[in-house]
């Protein structure tokens, strides 16, 4: 899907999603694209959720790049900022923190010809689908799935390791950075509460593991 290049000449807008674990460069890639569009005189507006308190009214990558953003609580607030202005692209950072209302908003924007680019975590610290992102991936025209580097072994990492409050009953959302999270590969991702599996799956794994011992 990465070879597909969205066109600005279509009557319907397109949606692109940039996803991956923490420390995979999602915001960096988002800002890089926005910078290129602005050089080409393409109008872009950026939104971010109010729950992300790490930066105020800006979207900032870990390499220091940043751009101005509008902080909103509800996805429907995006409409208020577009009524009197004709932006060609709406950019949304940290989209996993928005409710499923974001699906309706993105679909509506595409219907009226507005293009949307989104960045967000596709899985949470439990390695399970995160919030609205799976549905956004389903309706996206382009998906950029990024990898990070595992803090333990240096291999490609697809998961986010929470270093504190990492039990099932702990809050799903914990705003933080390197002090609270690391990127991990599947082998080194640790989650304290084991996921429930069926008896058939348990028996199958025991049989396979028994052959390798």
UniProtKB/Swiss-Prot annotation:
SUPFAM superfamilies in UniProt: Glucocorticoid receptor-like (DNA-binding domain), P-loop containing nucleoside triphosphate hydrolases
Catalysed conversion reaction: thymidine + ATP = dTMP + ADP + H(+)
Annotated GO CC locations: cytosol
Keywords of the record: ATP-binding, Cytoplasm, DNA synthesis, Kinase, Metal-binding, Nucleotide-binding, Transferase, Zinc
One Pfam family from the record: TK
Subcellular location: Cytoplasm
Active site (catalytic residues): 94
Binding site for Zn(2+): 150, 153, 185, 188
Disulfide bonds: none
InterPro entries named in the record: P-loop_NTPase, Thymidine_kinase, Thymidine_kinase_CS
Domain of life: Bacteria
GO biological process: DNA biosynthetic process; thymidine metabolic process
EC number: 2.7.1.21
GO molecular function, one term: zinc ion binding
Major localisation: cytoplasm
Residues that coordinate or bind ATP: 20-27, 93-96
Stated family: Belongs to the thymidine kinase family.
The protein's assembly and partners: Homotetramer.
Name of the featured protein: Thymidine kinase
Gene: tdk
């Amino acid at each position: 899907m990465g070879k597909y290049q969205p066109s600005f000449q279509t009557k319907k807008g397109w949606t692109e999603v940039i996803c991956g674990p923490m420390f995979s460069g999602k915001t960096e890639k988002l800002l890089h694209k926005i910078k290129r569009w602005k050089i080409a005189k393409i109008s872009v507006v950026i939104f971010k959720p109010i729950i992300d308190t790490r930066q105020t009214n800006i979207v900032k990558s870990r390499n220091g790049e940043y751009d101005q953003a509008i902080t909103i609580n509800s996805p429907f607030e995006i409409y208020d900022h577009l009524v009197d202005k004709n932006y060609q692209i709406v950019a949304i950072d940290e989209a996993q923190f928005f409710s499923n209302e974001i699906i309706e908003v993105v679909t509506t924007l595409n219907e009226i010809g507005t293009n949307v680019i989104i960045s967000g975590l596709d899985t949470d610290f439990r390695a399970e689908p995160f919030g609205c992102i799976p549905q956004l991936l389903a309706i996206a025209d382009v998906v950029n799935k990024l990898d990070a580097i595992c803090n333990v072994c240096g291999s490609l990492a697809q998961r986010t390791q929470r270093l504190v409050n990492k039990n099932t009953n702990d809050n799903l959302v914990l705003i933080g950075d390197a002090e609270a999270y690391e990127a991990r590969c599947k082998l080194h991702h640790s989650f304290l509460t084991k996921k429930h599996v069926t008896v058939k799956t348990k028996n199958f794994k025991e049989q396979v593991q028994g052959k390798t011992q």
